Amino acid sequence: MTGRLLIPGLIAASVCAVFAACLLGSTPMPADRVLAAFFGGADAGDRLVIWQIRLPRALAAYLTGAALGISGAALQGLLRNPLAEPGVLGVSASASLFATFSLYYGLTALAPWALPVAAILGALAATALIALAAIRTRSVVTLILIGVGLSSFAGAAMSLLMNLAPNPFSLSDMINWMLGSVANRSFEEIGLAAPFLIAGAGILLASRRGLSALTLGEE
């Protein structure tokens, strides 16, 4: 019974966390005003704060956390290591490197989707390298070492780009990207990321039996 209630309980807790995030801000908002803003009964100011600032920010954090949790669980099964996390194979660092390139060369000024597309391409490039390595070796340790090498290379390249940043604004954008932030998010940005998150989660959930089998060993 406890196992059956665990997932519904966690979902309920996460929904409560999103609602609590809508209460908090530079000016705390009572729960009744937040609910009124959700259902259209509040004034224009409250609706603007909830629908344009706090709710997109909360949903962005929620989806990001869910994606990191799912990918981390999948990597723990794949690598048979309870400490594995999304950055262990260098995918996160490669995504950051490509995003930093787009910021360095000003590609984000050409189109608002240039930055996330660059990050996705970086992640796919690292994933392709790891997949090619996995064809040649079945050693988990080798894959982890390749991932560590990718992360180190990406980190060094990002440091070089920051040192060569053409202006303070580009440097600030690079640092903000590397640190990460859910501030100033919008539903358009969430809509851009959501299909990839949903597709990835679906693939991992469909592969959960195979990932569970891998925890038994390479044989």
Describe each model-derived feature in a short phrase:
Residues 1-219:
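Alpha-helical transmembrane segments in inner-membrane proteins
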